[in-house]
Amino acid sequence: MQTYESDANIGNIKILAVDMDKTLLTDDRVLPQGLDERLDKLADAGIVFCPASGRPAPKLEEMFEGIKNRLAFCPDNGACVIYRGSYIYKSNIDVELYQQVLSRASKDPRAVPVLCCFDEFYVLARDHQYHDEISVYYNTINYVDSFEGIDFESNKISVFFPGYDAEPAFRETYSPEFSDKLYVTNAGREWIDFMNLGVDKGAGVAHLCEHLGIDIADAAAVGDTYNDIPMLERVGHSFIVDNAEEHMNAHAKWRIPSNNDGGVLTLIDAILAAR
């Protein structure tokens, strides 16, 4: 697979959408040193940097607190899009439909369901033991005895698998049962996410491009795993980190260094140098 240096039109990139976990973040789940000054340079050059993640908006904005109003965000796997502090797109799930998912996951001994309501999140009180793991991704967590009767505006249901068995659960249970009604995606060994059909990171990036009047051929995406495939296949410039799962080679054009080796920083430097 060719490296990023082979992208002859890298200087044409106007939007850079980047996955977070195992792509931008190191294995210790921290942002790479040297990112802040590069984000300033991208903004000054008129290039939109867009974290694209299964993480919700509050957590993403918290990670980029000092510069968030100069960025775009594609949280919740594209179920909403934010540009410079304002929502430009939301996709809410029908209450009856998300209750079906919550009911099924609540009966699964492997699963810890999370109802995502943009700024607040709901988890069963019985699952409070997993607070430390869940709070890595979700800020304001409300513990409830039951999901029954809840009808809040929601754009995503996430299911956490503390036994690291999300992949078989996705293949054997949740995708077969719900993929005709919702977009079901597997985000590594710990999480399965449910959004409306037609919602994914690729659609989120497309909404951002449309809002800004930018051709998606001039957008770039970087990822490492399954839920990054839609945006990698939709943009004009698709990159995977060197630590990406092997099957991802089929879904991107170019490779950059690993997350722990600052691959996204290397790509940003190359984009800026080519302008």
PLM regions: where:
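Short, structured coil segments at secondary-structure junctions
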Residues: 66-69, 77, 177-180, 234-235, ...
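N-terminal glycine-/serine-/threonine-rich phosphate-binding loop
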Residues: 5-45
